[in-house]
């Protein structure tokens, strides 16, 4: 069984489905755990990130990040640059969308955000533009809606994805290149393989990190949550609800998680840096005593405070007398005698 844990960015051609690419990568690499991040329709090309091995657990994290596309909009009438740019401004920000009829999700009204909409080129009725958007935005629907606002109608003619989260077009490799890399790897030449294979922690370059102590790793491996006692440090000032990457003190990625509180609320992460321990319990002539940590004073006991007795009964003889009166075994009168004796002393006060 293969032990590949990372990502490969495939330049998906038009024609095959995203699931067919999964199958081909599975055959090429020998890794049974393969999944893609963000489905591309058969007629769409571009960045298709393949997760292998343990990286399949990180698919949802990458899928939530923004995506970038280059598309061609075909309108049914001619427009000038100013008209197109004016409509693009209306579609920048949060918009309403209903997924197209041919989609893998239910056709319900939803809100998606367009971060940037840039006009690149125009030729007759064809408009080339670039869009950076929230995950789950349908570019086909966006083109149709832009056509309605223009007045003549329009539809998507071409679409290519150029970025998914931190993976951009410059990191793409064809299926043939991926196949060649693994064939050369099996022959001992890993140069091309190292060029196309991306480790898991690449996606966390801009994420806040939580560095845990070695003593916490066993519990984390069993799925336990992380508590302040197991944290060595936090970088990036994450807020409640933020996704964080969990690293060891040796900079090894071991888990991901969600912050339950703000980083500045973990007040007991490291409050006091201890220089000297002053409360060690030692042994001095058979009696427990507090001993100073400093070796120069190692054998010098610290005087314990005098034990205070109940009420005003400070003298040992007085305590014994009172105890005898209250203890039938010592010739006293029981609890009643002790109570009455205590009330008498209380009255004298």
Swiss-Prot record:
Q: Which residues form a coiled coil?
A: none
InterPro entries listed in its UniProt record? PsdUridine_synth_cat_dom_sf, PsdUridine_synth_N, PUA, PUA-like_sf, PUA_sf, tRNA_PsdUridine_synth_B_fam, TruB_arch, TruB_C
SUPFAM superfamilies documented for this protein: Pseudouridine synthase, PUA domain-like
The Basic and acidic residues compositionally biased stretches are 300-309
Locate the PUA domain: which residues?
207-279
Q: Which family does it belong to?
A: Belongs to the pseudouridine synthase TruB family. Type 2 subfamily.
Q: What does this protein do?
A: Could be responsible for synthesis of pseudouridine from uracil-55 in the psi GC loop of transfer RNAs.
Q: What is this protein called?
A: Probable tRNA pseudouridine synthase B
Whichever gene encodes this chain, its name is truB
